[in-house]
Amino acid sequence: MQYTEVMVRYGELSTKGKNRKDFIGRLAGNVTRALQDFPEIEIHPKHDRMHIVLNGAPFETIDQRLKLVFGIQTYSPTIKVDKNLDAIKKASLELMQATFKDGMTFKVNTRRSDHDFEYDTNQLNMMIGDYLFDNMDNLKVQMKKPDLVLRIEVRQDAIYISNQLLHGAGGMPVGTAGKAVMMLSGGIDSPVASYLAMKRGVEIDMVHFFSPPYTTEKALAKAKELTGILANYSGKINFIAVPFTEIQEQIKEKLPEGYLMTIQRRFMLQLADRIRAMRGGLAIFNGESVGQVASQTLESMVAINDVTSTPVLRPVATMDKTEIIKLAEQIGTFDLSIEPFEDCCTIFAPPRPKTKPKLDEARKLEDRLDAEGMIQRAIDGMEITPIYPNQKFLDDKAQEDADLL
């Protein structure tokens, strides 16, 4: 079926009042970026919906891209025809023949914004319905929840016909809620938290801590490749690799075992906050889920959050692990997340970490270290890499090695 355009309906933009124009502009920019390798396409954002004129571009490919753009509630592949009855009949029949399967029910639903058109909605519903019955077999009308709804929209410029209502990613356009940093490990939770942050319109920079020689280049490549998967939802994500070896070695050498995890996380949060300020971010996101591990008890969060007044947001905080895994599978990060490359969150992990660390004790222990010096050296050593959708960093040999572990 050769569609002429795609009609996009906005998600929560309708709730944004005076900022609506800016939100629609941001969404149009994000759609343009997602479809940038189709120069023939024209994108026309309007107050109530967006029209994507295909000009011969294949809808099947466009469909896969639009599913990944936050801010789109629903969209429909559409045929645009002249405002005459014969053109409406012809396009309606072609569309139904291309999508109808035996046993399906249908109805015709007409809307008019051009009230000067010669037929009203009831007349069009009846005439097009009768025409379809005369030219197709096994049709069955059902007014409530039919399998197919043939939608006819009579507008000032033309008539638009569709019979599919496809669901988009929902949420808000990335970039409309400001900028933040995301503390990305190589595990399951933080990529899911990243996805949920972007779904709320947040533009994120990834902050990843690595500790060579204890962590390998493969672990770093894995985190970058996870970022490449997530970049499908935003177009590009800056990946900030922060060296963490010195800090981990000093903590292990000088502090009691039970507080290693707490102090490590305090340093990570301080570094993330410094980077946030440097990058113009407003918040810090992470993948913590309440009670999942020792560093994620409420007592631990109090002892760790003490180092910053910046909002620390945890999108998966109340989700069960099974819920997080299900979403990771849905967004395509799960298989890579479970590849067994050790990251800095697992090295030096004490066998009996404190689950209820004391804030005063954490502060005293941290004071034994050259905190400011180590933080500054880590900042000086960080590397920023722009990462694009589906960019690869793990070679085939690395994947084979992971499969053997």
UniProtKB/Swiss-Prot annotation:
Pathway in which the depicted protein is active: Cofactor biosynthesis; thiamine diphosphate biosynthesis
Catalyses which reaction(s): [ThiI sulfur-carrier protein]-S-sulfanyl-L-cysteine + a uridine in tRNA + 2 reduced [2Fe-2S]-[ferredoxin] + ATP + H(+) = [ThiI sulfur-carrier protein]-L-cysteine + a 4-thiouridine in tRNA + 2 oxidized [2Fe-2S]-[ferredoxin] + AMP + diphosphate; [ThiS sulfur-carrier protein]-C-terminal Gly-Gly-AMP + S-sulfanyl-L-cysteinyl-[cysteine desulfurase] + AH2 = [ThiS sulfur-carrier protein]-C-terminal-Gly-aminoethanethioate + L-cysteinyl-[cysteine desulfurase] + A + AMP + 2 H(+)
Residue ranges of domain THUMP in the record: 60-165
GO molecular function, one term: tRNA-uracil-4 sulfurtransferase activity
EC number of this enzyme: 2.8.1.4
Entry superkingdom: Bacteria
Name of the protein described by the UniProt record: Probable tRNA sulfurtransferase
Organism whose genome encodes this protein: Lactobacillus johnsonii (strain CNCM I-12250 / La1 / NCC 533)
Gene this protein is translated from: thiI
